[in-house]
Every structure is written in C-alpha cells, then in structure tokens.
Amino acid sequence: EPFRPFAWPIQYIQTVGYPIVGLGVIDTTLVVLTQGRPYFIQGSHPSSSIMVEADINQACLSKRSIVSMGNAVFYASPDGLVGLSPGGSAVVTESLFDKFTWQDTGPADLLGCMYENKYVGFYNVSSGIGGFIYDMKAKTWNFHTVYATGGYNDLKNDALYIIQSNELSKWDSGTALSYIWKSKKFTFPEPKSFACYRVQAEGYPVTTKIYRDGVSIVSLSVTDDSLRRLPAGLGTDWEFQLE
C-alpha cells in the first residue's frame, strides 16, 4: 500500500526461486533479476499483484549492469546482454558475437547506463579498460575506450554523467574521439573485381582501408566523396574499414 512498508502485511510477500540480484521496472511491472531465471511482478496494488516467471534461462551476473530502458530491462548474463520484457525476452548480442567474446568484457563487474535509447557499458578486465554501446533501434554494437566507475542518467537535462578518476564528466560533450568501423567479411562464390569506391561522410578526412583476400590494397586518407579507382585484381573475400 502507498506509504506503507513494502512487505507489510505478510500476505504481500512474494517469493522467488533464486537469490535476488537486483530490480528493474517496465511501466507497472516490476522485474526481479536473480541468480537463476528472472521474474515479472505485475499489478497496481500489492494485494492483487501476480508473479510470473520469465521465459528465458539467463541469470543476472551484475546488479550494476541492470538498466531500465522504456519497454525493456537490460542486464548482463553469462551468454550476453539480455533484453527482458513481458512481450518477449532474448540475448540481444547473440547474433553479434559468441559467449566467449562476451566473457572478455567482464560481465560480472559490468556497469550499465542509458543514453539516448542506447545501452552504454563500462568494464575493467585484465586485458584493459573500456566499454561498449548497444543501439536498441539499429541493433548495432560498438566498442569504445572510455572507462567509468559510476554513472547517472539525468532525465531532466537529457544527460548522462559518469565518474572518471573521482571526477564527474558529461557523456558525449567533450572532444570527439576517433572511431573505427570495419565491415564483415564479404565472401563471394567466385573471385570478383571492383573498379572504384566512394566514401560519403559528414566530415573529412576519413582513413579508408580495403582488404582483398586478407591483403590491404587501399590505405588512404580520403578528403572528399570523389570516385577513386581500386587496384586491379580479383578476390573472393572483401573487407572495408573506415576511421
């Protein structure tokens, strides 16, 4: 009841089957993340609330990884980043990389934040510090080199504040960082040759690299969107990188 202790009277107590790690919220639904399966508690009043076990076998590894983002709650599981909602749940990173690559980000100590409908993660592992950004709408994943020990999403000012070396910083407000994008490997059934390429960007210069059968055939700082010729030759595997 409003303004009453959450578990009083005793009839209001809900019991889950695993130790609780943390909580999330979706509208009027409370999301309970545990060391086993997650649960939904739905209802407008404690006396009429209903608890439902989620349809996904993914434990929550880190309380600090839990982020409530509109119609879903995201958290770190052993297999990847999970998006959880009453309408359906899934490991959203499953198609991006495998379980072992995910483990390299240290999900047990992952810090999660929200910014512009994106999940921003920060990690500190033996191989180094850094983080990643998962865009829910575009279904894309990008790594970054920024590390933070804490974060706060200020809805009033539409800003994300992070803690770096005991100092407060505003996300996406400082000097622009370099960005590297590399395509997947395009494999053709027969060797192919391409005549030219064009790089269209919001700003220049853009360092462009093109690989044919694993060998770099172009490495050039492009300053405009002019057509440029490719070196002659056939290749089965093609990759493209922009920086």
Where are these regions (language model features)?
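N-terminal beta-propeller domains
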Residues: 1-40, 121-134
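Generic low-complexity segments that are intrinsically disordered, proline-rich and/or Lys/Arg-biased
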Residues: 3-6, 10, 47, 206, ...
